[in-house]
Each structure stands twice: as structure tokens, then as C-alpha cells.
Amino acid sequence: NDLLVQFQSIGPYVLANSYFYQSYYNQGLVTAVSQLREQLQVIIAMGDYLDNAKYGLSHTHSAIKHHMPLMRYKPSTHLESIHKEVPVFIVGNGPSLDDLIPLIKEEADAAIIVSCGTALQTLYKHGITPHFHAEIESNRSTYDWAIRVNAPDYLKQISLISCNGIHPDTCNLYKDVYLAFKQGEASTVSIAELYPKKTFGALDAAYPTVTNFAMNLLTEIGFEQFYLFGTDMGFVDENYHHSKSSGYYSEKGNELYDYTAENNTSLILPGNFRPVVKTKYEFKVSKSVLENVLSVKKAEVYNLNDGAKIAGTKPLRKEDAILVCSAAQRDAAVEAMKQQVFKELDFDDFEKRFNNRYDSNVLIEELSQFHLLVPTELESKEDLTVLIEEQRNFVVKSLLNKNSLLFFYLNGTLNYINSS
């Protein structure tokens, strides 16, 4: 973690000229270096970028304008212990979900049901209405997937939980919306600067999948008992990678596109109920991020899936699941979470703070100056190194001047381009 922080502070673009050297063989060191290499790739590949920053700020502005509440600082202190004890079903769209649907139906009154991403279509087909639906993408794909359910009245029974950058059209589909800032994103950092510290909470591990967001949010709120359905993080059969009731398959159960051709599914992970399963890189990262969250949270997490083994969870066969919670307790916990953990921002006050801090005229002038940094021709590798350093210094200076959005818009994209 110290090395990751150091790379961020000096500029991730230095990865282009970074090398790993081991002076002697040590298995523990080999593993650590391998993990560091993967995490450094994640910093670049999954970092912020111009479009995400631009749309994130626009969508957050819309959310505040339409009175959508945001997660408070240290949210677990705002929820009573009795509510934290209510079980939570995290429902992903992995292949194991098909076999676990009967258990979800059987225990529906004893838990808070949270559907994640494309799992919503599967739950709808089986007559299950979740209390919350989680989404994480800022683009409009979350709207397009949801309307494929083709049941607007069904969606209006469900509360949406998401990050602050969620698309406004997606928000309009649901009964109500509850948001959390996502740490490290331009929209989060730029808006956090407008308010005193300890005003809002922010999620540190809400990536790369929506399951990571849901688990990060709900463990941060303080819930203590989780059951994982369809969060496989891998698959036994490469042709059976999601629930067959979802949009990845036809009504006859055939793949709508060649999943293995589009994804490298050759990675191997230890299995939850079997020695090994296959996976793809995104799921491998997702598993690792989730394991880091569970290592520091006080929660009992049961993994019912025939997928990847997840450190910090307990393998649980569906026939061994026993829940003790009433529907009344569950409903009280849902209501308490909505009322006590999230709060609205005054839009007029927000807009005043924002306009006082960020001047669009300064941004336009800085963009003109930034453009002049680029010479018509680069004659050597040294010229390129100088240019990269000048660009870095320029955007950092803008950040320190505290009157422009230039750093928030360009930092992630520059890091990506200059580390290639």
C-alpha cells in the first residue's frame, strides 16, 4: 500500500519506466511483487478519466438538485445495533444464482434483498422484488439494462443505491435513490473540497464490480450478516458464466454472444466448493478488493456459490442456511437506513459554494495555456519526458490555485496516456 501511495503522489506515469528487480529468490517476495504488479495495472486501467470526471460532476449536480440524499460521515454511527443485525442478501448475476433462487424466495421475509446490476432481470423473472437495487456505472447502460425488464411498476417498488455519478435517467426509474461518494473520483474530490471535513462518507473499495460497491456500502453502514448469492467471481463452465435467466442468454438458454471470445476466461482460482474454478481478470480483481474489505470489517459473510473461494467468507450449502429475523424487523432496518444514514444537501447553498470555488473562465484560459505546452514536434525520448513533467506540474499548480476544475478533468487521462 505504501508503494501504491508513492506512485500516486509522484505520478503514475512513471510506471512506463519502472522495473522490478529481485536480488534473491523468496517465494513470499515473488507473490508480493506479482500482486503489486497487478495492483499497479489496476491504478492505470481503472483510474479516473476525462469523460468519467465530466459526467460524474454533471450527474452529481443533477442528483443534488433533485434532492437525492448522500451517505453521511461514519454512517455506522447513525444506525442502531438492532438494525445492523438484520441479514442482507447480496444478489449478483453469476451462474450459481439459478440454483439459489428457491432459497431467496423461501427466506425473503427474513432479510434485506439487494440486487446487483444485471441480476435484477433474473429476480423479476422469478417474481422476487428486492428492497434495493445497486448500480455503479455512470453511463446510460444502467438505464438500458433496467428497462429490458419491461415492467415500470416493478421498478417503482425498488429503491436504488449507487455512487454519486449515476445517470439521471436511471434514477428516474426507481421509487427513490440513495447515493454515496466514491473515493478518488474527480466528482467526489472536487465536491468534498466545498464542505468541512467529516460532512460525508466516501467508499474506498466500490470497484470494479457492482457487487464490490454493494458490499463496501453496506459494511460501511454497519450491517453484520451477509449471504452471497450469484456473486461467483468465477465459473465452472466457460459457457455458463451468468444466470441463464438474465440478458446474457436467450429464452432457450443459449449465449447471445461468445463470452469466451470477448474475455480471457483462462485464469484459475481456488473454488468455494471445489478445488478450482475459471475466471477473468475483472472478477479476480473484484475478489481481491472484496477480501480486503472483509479483512477490516466486523461481519459474518456466507458464500453459497459454486464459484471462487473468497477469503473472509464462510462456505455455506443452501440446505444449511437458517435465518432468524422477522419481516417487521427487516422493514424497520430498511426504513432506519434510509432515514438516518443518508442526508440531502441544500442545492442553493451547494451551487453558491461550487461557483465560488470553480471559475469556468479560468478553466478555459488554463486549457489554452495547456495546449501551448505541446510542441509541434518531439525529437527525442528526453523531449517526451520533459513534456510529461511539464504537464504534470501544470495540472498540479492548477489544483493548488483552487479556482479551476482542470486538475479534476485531466489528471486521470494524463496519467493513462503518459504511462502507456
PLM features per residue range, with description:
Residues 208, 257-308:
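Polyanion-binding loop/helix "lid" in catalytic or ligand-binding cores
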Residues 69-140:
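Secondary-structure-rich domain cores
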Residues 134-143, 147-156, 180-184, 243-262, ...:
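Acidic, Ser/Thr-rich peripheral helices and adjacent loops at domain boundaries
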Residues 117-121, 162-168, 305-309:
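Short, polar loop motifs at secondary-structure junctions
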Residues 1-52, 124-213, 219-221, 379, ...:
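Acidic/Gly/His-enriched mid-domain segments of enzyme catalytic cores or analogous surface patches
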Residues 292, 296-420:
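Long, compositionally biased charged/polar accessory segments in the mid-to-C-terminal portions
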Residues 25-86, 97:
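Aromatic- and Gly/Pro-rich donor/ligand-binding loops
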